[in-house]
Curated annotation (Swiss-Prot):
S-S pairs: C37-C56, C90-C190
Gene Ontology BP terms: cellular response to exogenous dsRNA; cellular response to lipopolysaccharide; defense response to bacterium; positive regulation of immune response to tumor cell; positive regulation of macrophage activation; positive regulation of natural killer cell activation; positive regulation of nitric oxide biosynthetic process; positive regulation of type II interferon production
Expression by tissue: Expressed predominantly in embryonic brain.
Protein name (record): Retinoic acid early-inducible protein 1-beta
Gene3D superfamilies recorded: MHC class I-like antigen recognition-like
Signal sequence range: 1-28
Superkingdom of origin: Eukaryota
Gene name, Swiss-Prot/TrEMBL: Raet1b
Compositional bias segments (type: Low complexity): 211-221
Protein family (similarity comment): Belongs to the NKG2D ligand family.
GO MF assignments: natural killer cell lectin-like receptor binding
Amino acid sequence: MAKAAVTKRHHFMIQKLLILLSYGYTNGLDDAHSLRCNLTIKDPTPADPLWYEAKCFVGEILILHLSNINKTMTSGDPGETANATEVKKCLTQPLKNLCQKLRNKVSNTKVDTHKTNGYPHLQVTMIYPQSQGRTPSATWEFNISDSYFFTFYTENMSWRSANDESGVIMNKWKDDGEFVKQLKFLIHECSQKMDEFLKQSKEKPRSTSRSPSITQLTSTSPLPPPSHSTSKKGFISVGLIFISLLFAFAFAM
């Protein structure tokens, strides 16, 4: 019994390290040269009628904020450029449509209610790095109630889940052709405008601080395909956590 408890603790520790590994890697991708959109889908209540919210950032700058309550576009930059305005116009309707689709999918997804504590709470992060001459691509991270995690890479149209339970849900979502088309369409439709805006943002002085994405601290999604570029900071984080994993496995033996 004691041995089983120790093993369970080791497995829990390893799971947390894997979460940090995902955070460290993705944080290397998520900087002022990337556009990040955080989407939240939840069950509305009479006290809080909010059921969807979408926020898009470049670095620390909020360039777009949408919800079913506040449908106006906002920006954290008083000196907003024409490129920023074009990006917002391009993203607004596709994001609204996607949030409605996500709401329908969550409502029709069977989950363990003990894990989700009722209606599933969905968090989605889209990260679009500046294409720099490559085929425009993005990473979509899905987090259902901090219990089910999977990722979609538009670059090679691949899906990866954190575990078997997440894989069951992921496989149903990936088989929805209309849904996948929406994820791809948003990137294809707005890639040129996003690249122009990111190029302009890259030339501006920026803060070195970063805020984690909506799913980064909880997502256990696997590493992106090797063709994605990473910063030195991302590699350092991966290296340190890999060493920690080795120690964790050693103690678990």
